């Protein structure tokens, strides 16, 4: 069992664990040798090595956006996103070579904005990382993306909010 959360909150293990528990996304490398977690509150990418003999060990923690959160009233250990929370990873999938992510970056207040229904704050980019945590590429789609999956490294499928939840076929490295 792995219980060593990266120190991202500055407030200790319980808050770090809460940040990683709140709507985080997870992807596993095809050979099961690595696992990645991306936080929704802030954008923290945590990549771990999985070894049957050595157990689980950290590979890279990449702090893209600082995890700013709001405490839930009457529940001291619970947190949620707030107006100043950078929204991080909304979706994640993996191949043997790359992590394909929807990394947003908008602030929580934009999710509650009056025009959010007509102009929703979803990302239009697929952000691609290698399994060592290096940013490899961003593919701009021109569509507001809500979910994605990949088929190897040549094709991603994504759900676009813009066109009544249409399914897009995207070639991320073209």
Report each predicted region and the residues it spans.
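Surface-exposed loop and turn segments in beta-propeller and other repeat-based domains
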Residues: 1-21, 51-84, 142-144
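Structural signature of eukaryotic scaffold interfaces centered on beta-propeller domains
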Residues: 18-41, 84-95, 148-151
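Residue position within the beta-strands of beta-propeller blades
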Residues: 37, 101-102, 157-159
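Short glycine/acidic-enriched loop and turn motifs that connect beta-strands
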Residues: 41-44, 106-110, 162-165
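Loop/turn-rich, solvent-exposed surfaces of beta-rich toroidal or solenoidal domains
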Residues: 82-129
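Blade-level signature of beta-propeller repeat domains, shared across WD40, Kelch, NHL, RCC1
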Residues: 149-174
């Amino acid at each position: 069992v792995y219980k060593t959360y990266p120190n991202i909150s500055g407030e200790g293990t319980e808050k770090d664990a809460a940040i990683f528990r709140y709507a985080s996304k997870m992807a596993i490398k095809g050979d099961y040798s690595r696992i990645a977690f991306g936080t929704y509150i802030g954008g923290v990418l945590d990549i771990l090595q999985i070894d049957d003999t050595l157990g689980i060990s950290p590979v890279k923690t990449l702090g893209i956006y600082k995890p700013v959160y709001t405490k839930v009233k009457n529940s001291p250990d619970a947190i949620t996103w707030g107006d100043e929370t950078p929204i991080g990873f909304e979706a994640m999938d993996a191949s043997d070579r790359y992590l394909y992510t929807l990394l947003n970056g908008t602030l929580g207040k934009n999710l509650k904005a009056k025009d959010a229904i007509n102009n929703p704050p979803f990302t239009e980019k697929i952000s691609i990382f290698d399994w060592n945590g290096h940013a490899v590429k961003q593919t701009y789609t021109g569509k507001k993306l809500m979910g994605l999956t990949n088929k190897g490294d040549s094709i991603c499928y994504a759900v676009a909010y813009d066109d009544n939840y249409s399914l897009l076929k995207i070639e991320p490295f073209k």
